[in-house]
Every structure is written in C-alpha cells, then in structure tokens.
C-alpha cells in the first residue's frame, strides 16, 4: 500500500477554488476533477518507484554483505537464474569452508608427537611413489671359520664326572669350554664285580675350547701336573695327562666315535647270530636224541615180548641186535703222518733226542 505524503484537506485553497464556493461551475468542476486524477496518478507512480528503489537498495545491501564475507563482488545486472546458481555455489563454498575449519581444529588438537608420526604418512601419500630398488639375491655365504681347539685326556681320575671336569678347568681360567666327551671305562672280565658301587669311571676324554689359543695354553700348563685344590679333596694328588690335538675338530671325533660304535655293534651282531645258530643246532641234536631214545625203548619192549613167547634162540638173536643198536656212532681216527709205527729206527731217534737234551741241560 502506498502512503499519501500530501494531505489535500490541509492545502491552502486557491482563488479558483474560492470562487467555486459561491456557485456551481461545471467546467471548473471537470477541470478540478481532472487535476485531482492527475495528482493521484503521479502520487501513485512516485510511491511505486520509491518502493521499488527501497527493495532494490535492500537487495543490494544484502548482496554487498555477502560479498564482503566471501570477498567476491557481484554485478547488479544478474538474472534470477544466475542468482540461483550463485546461491548453490555459495552453499558449496560454505560447506568446504566448514570442512577446512574442522580439519584445522582437528590438527590443532593433535599432540606434536602424533603430528610427527602422521607427517611422514601424509607426505608419503602426497609425494609421488618412489621406485623400489631391486635387491640382489642372497649369495651363498661362506661358512664361518671354526676356530675351536680340542685337547685329549689320556687318563682321568676315578669317578670324575664331565661337569666336574669342566668346572675344574674353568676355575683355573681356561674357558669358555663348549663341549666335553668322556668314554666310559669297560670293566675287564678278570676284575671283580662290584654291585654296590653305582658310580661310573671314565677311561679317557676330549674337551673342546672356544679358541685354539686357550686349548694350547691349557695343555702346556696343566700337563704332567697334579690336579691340586684343597688338601682333603678327592682328586688332589691325581695327575693331568693331556695333549693338544693340532688340526683336530669335534666333527672328526664324532665320526671316529660313531665308527667305533658301529663296528662294536656289528661285532656284537655277528656274535649274537653265531650264538643263535649254535643254540639252534644243539637243540636240534637234543630233540633228535630224545626221538631216537624213544624209538629204542619201543623196539626193546617189542623184542622182549617176542622173546618171552619165542624160543631161547630168538632171545640170543634179540640180545645181539640190541648190542648192535647201541653202537650208533662211529668216529674214524685219522692216522698221523710219519708216526712211530712207520719209523724204522726207533733207537736212532732216541739217541738224537738224548744228545739234544744233554746239550740243553
């Protein structure tokens, strides 16, 4: 609605209007009506223009405020379609701005250690992918040199155990010791058996040191010396008998031990098979002898029954047959070559024997 800025009733009456009060004039009335209509039209048009200008000013002020926030001026001669597109773009820009603000807030809240840990990952993502270097295939590495040394102990104190030997050598400063091997002593058949004593004694042994130098020094210093220690010790007066084995390794010792063990097992196997065969032959002979004895007994019983019923001649024949049956095996004796039976001059041989004996005694 347009508002009237001018009040007609408060206007000063002109001279023409003053004359109209006196009498009615049709022409003057028509002219006055036309003037009023013109005035009304001009007022309405002016009001409309003022309203449009105020609306345009408001829209321009809003656009200017938006452009100040965004930093992008807009022209006044844009169509409604462009304004809609601009609104959509403004909303998208606002969304991006919000995302950027959120990202900045998130990075601000992170601790410096976390940011450092995440920085290489982000840089790796943004940076270009680097080419992987081709690693050469693992070549066959040469085996490490075996710098160990081995000493041989030809005799050991009685009932000395491997860990006791190792501790004795290490307490004297000869170490580190990597391996110890002692061969158990095999009791002889003539020696008396001791069932009560369960402790083992060892005949000889080998000790491997981590370095050759310590093995040489140990063999040179301790060889042909007493074990020592406390005076009341069990091994105080025993003597060390050791030698450094030059160019000898633990693998060689194991090969030798395995070879001896395999030979021992093979000999034992052969002896076992031989003993089994002998036992089998003996059992077969015993069984055959029992069978023959049973047959002989049955035959004798039959002959006795026949002899009782028959004549005396029959009994004599049965006795002769029984004597023949008893002689089952005959061993043929081999004659000795050049025996006394075939020597012609026994007296000459006796003379020669006497002469030799007289020279000796």
UniProtKB/Swiss-Prot annotation:
Signal peptide: none annotated. Keywords: Nucleus, Ribosome biogenesis, RNA-binding, rRNA processing. The keyword Zinc does not apply. Residues 20-34, 55-67 have a biased composition (Basic and acidic residues). It is found in: Nucleus, Nucleolus. Coiled coil: none annotated. GO terms for biological process: endonucleolytic cleavage in 5'-ETS of tricistronic rRNA transcript (SSU-rRNA, 5.8S rRNA, LSU-rRNA); endonucleolytic cleavage in ITS1 to separate SSU-rRNA from 5.8S rRNA and LSU-rRNA from tricistronic rRNA transcript (SSU-rRNA, 5.8S rRNA, LSU-rRNA); endonucleolytic cleavage to generate mature 5'-end of SSU-rRNA from (SSU-rRNA, 5.8S rRNA, LSU-rRNA); small-subunit processome assembly. Residues 149-239 form the RRM domain. GO terms for molecular function: RNA binding. Residues 111-129 have a biased composition (Low complexity). Residues 84-94 have a biased composition (Acidic residues). Residues 1-145, 293-320 are annotated as: Disordered. Its main location: nucleus. InterPro entries: ABT1/Esf2 (IPR039119), ABT1/ESF2_RRM (IPR034353), Nucleotide-bd_a/b_plait_sf (IPR012677), RBD_domain_sf (IPR035979). The keyword rRNA processing applies. One of its GO terms (cellular component) is nucleolus. Belongs to the ESF2/ABP1 family. Involved in the small subunit (SSU) processome assembly and function, and in the 18S rRNA synthesis. Required for the early cleavages at sites A0, A1 and A2. This is Pre-rRNA-processing protein esf2. The lineage of its organism: Eukaryota, Fungi, Dikarya, Ascomycota, Pezizomycotina.
């Amino acid at each position: 609605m347009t508002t009237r800025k001018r009040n007609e009733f408060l206007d000063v009456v002109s001279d023409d209007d003053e004359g109209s009060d006196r009498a009615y004039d049709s022409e003057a009335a028509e002219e006055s009506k036309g003037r009023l209509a013109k005035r009304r039209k001009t007022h309405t048009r002016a009001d409309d223009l003022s309203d449009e200008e105020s609306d345009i000013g408001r829209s321009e002020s809003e656009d200017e405020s938006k452009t100040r926030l965004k930093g992008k001026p807009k022209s006044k001669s844009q169509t409604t379609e462009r304004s809609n597109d601009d609104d959509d773009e403004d909303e998208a820009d606002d969304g991006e701005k919000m995302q950027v603000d959120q990202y900045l807030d998130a990075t601000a809240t992170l601790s410096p250690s976390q940011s450092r840990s995440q920085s290489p990952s982000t840089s790796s993502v943004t940076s270009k992918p680097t080419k992987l270097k081709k690693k050469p295939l693992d070549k066959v590495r040469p085996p490490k040199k075996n710098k160990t040394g081995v000493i041989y102990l030809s005799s050991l104190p009685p009932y000395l155990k491997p860990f006791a030997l190792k501790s004795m050598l290490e307490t004297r400063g000869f170490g580190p010791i990597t391996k110890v091997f002692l061969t158990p002593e095999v009791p002889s058949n003539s020696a008396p058996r001791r069932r009560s004593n369960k402790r083992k004694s060892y005949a000889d042994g080998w000790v491997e040191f981590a370095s050759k130098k310590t093995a040489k020094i140990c063999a040179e210093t301790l060889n042909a010396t007493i074990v020592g220690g406390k005076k009341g010790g069990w091994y105080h007066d025993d003597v060390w008998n050791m030698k450094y084995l030059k160019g000898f390794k633990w693998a060689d010792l194991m090969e030798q031990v395995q070879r001896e063990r395999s030979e021992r097992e093979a000999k034992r196997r052969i002896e076992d098979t031989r003993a089994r065969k002998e036992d089998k032959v003996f059992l077969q002979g015993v069984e055959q002898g029992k069978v023959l004895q049973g047959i002989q007994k049955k035959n004798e019983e039959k002959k006795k029954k026949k002899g009782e019923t028959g004549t005396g001649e029959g009994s004599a024949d049965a006795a002769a047959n029984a004597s023949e049956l008893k002689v089952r095996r005959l061993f043929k004796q081999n004659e000795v070559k050049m025996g006394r039976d075939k020597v012609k001059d026994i007296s000459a041989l006796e003379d020669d024997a006497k002469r030799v004996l007289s020279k000796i005694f």
